Design a protein with these regions (language model features):
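Hydrophobic alpha-helical transmembrane segments of polytopic membrane proteins
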Residues: 121-144, 165, 216-225
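Short hydrophobic, aromatic-rich alpha-helical segments embedded in or entering the lipid bilayer
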Residues: 1, 169-211
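Alpha-helical transmembrane segments of multipass membrane proteins
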Residues: 2, 25, 104-109, 127, ...
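Hydrophobic alpha-helical transmembrane segments of integral membrane proteins
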Residues: 13-17, 156-157, 163-166, 182-183, ...
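Transmembrane helix-boundary elements of multi-pass transport/secretion proteins
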Residues: 2-71, 82, 88-96, 100, ...
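Small-residue-enriched core segments of transmembrane alpha-helices in multipass membrane transport
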Residues: 43-46, 51, 122-135, 155-163, ...
Length: 295
């Protein structure tokens, strides 16, 4: 039933289906010019957009369900708030996987991409990514009262996520100030984790920082969302309770400070981007370069 309700949500369909495919063909056909190696390089950012779409789609869906009284119907059943939120995440995950699979299929059939790196790492990064960004969407839905408020807050969060993380513009191409800010964003770790897994075939133990940071953040945001969850549109949460939502920024605030000192992701993303540019200059066949140094 949760899957059927999710499919009725236009926001979810746009951000988790239509937008990812639009970016896929834009990146693969225009930016990569159909070159298989370049398409493979861009698959990480493209798939990350599909994964992050669960944030916008789920927050909008939950607020809509609350305004329309659908959550009230669930409330009279033995379903707990944790059950409701968990089922929402599972529904988004089940519906996001076909989008990711189709993007990989199109890359193979249309653009001739051979091999997609370490698929186990890709699946794990997609899984923790969907759970973490969907949980953030649940937090937004819990602290906003109307769809208008939800859309405003989503925009404020969404724009930095897609423009400063490497999802739409390579991190190596961003100004240094934007790069320094980007490492505070969870999307940056999702984008690089997927790109490292697909382009460099990185096993999951080489992506421990990206995977564990997203997993820890998912647990925290889900817990906060469960504490703030409301079944009724008339229910309000105290203003001081919203500080729980602000606490969800703490993990990546600390990780961003550390990363700005270490510079690991910035160096690796620059090396990856330069390797693709070097390949273009030498006009060699679509061989995948050796991975950068292990973390």
């Amino acid at each position: 039933m949760r899957i059927r309700l999710t499919l009725r949500n236009k926001m979810f369909l746009f951000f988790s289906v239509i937008m990812p495919f639009g970016f896929f063909f834009l990146y693969a056909g225009v930016f990569a010019k159909g070159d298989p190696a370049a398409v493979r390089f861009l698959l990480g950012p493209v798939i990350s957009l599909a994964v992050m779409g669960s944030f916008w789609g789920l927050s909008a869906a939950l607020v809509t369900f609350r305004e329309q009284g659908i959550l009230r119907r669930f409330h009279v059943t033995p379903v707990t708030s944790g059950d409701m939120l968990a089922s929402s995440i599972v529904a988004n995950y089940v519906l996001t996987l076909p989008t990711v699979a189709l993007e990989l299929l199109f890359a193979r059939v249309i653009f001739g991409v051979h091999g997609f790196g370490d698929l186990a790492s890709v699946l794990i990064m997609v899984t923790v990514g969907v759970v973490s960004f969907a949980s953030m969407g649940l937090v937004v839905a819990s602290v906003t009262n109307t769809m208008q408020e939800t859309q405003v807050l989503n925009q404020l969060i969404w724009l930095p996520l897609i423009f400063l993380s490497g999802a739409t513009v390579p991190l190596a191409d961003l100004p240094k100030v934007a790069q320094a800010f980007g490492v505070f964003l969870p999307a940056t770790y999702l984008v690089w984790g997927l790109q490292d897994a697909i382009y460099f075939s990185a096993p999951i133990w080489h992506l421990w920082k990206e995977a564990l940071s997203l997993l820890g953040w998912a647990i925290l945001t889900f817990f906060v969302a469960a504490q703030l969850f409301r079944w009724e549109p008339e229910s309000k949460i105290p203003r001081n309770a919203k500080l729980w939502a602000a606490a969800t920024a703490l993990p990546f605030l600390l990780l961003g400070i550390w990363e700005n000192q270490a510079g690991t992701i910035l160096l690796q993303s620059k090396a990856a981007y330069q390797s693709l540019q070097h390949r273009d200059r030498t006009t060699q066949p679509s061989n995948v370069p050796d991975p950068p140094a292990n973390k």
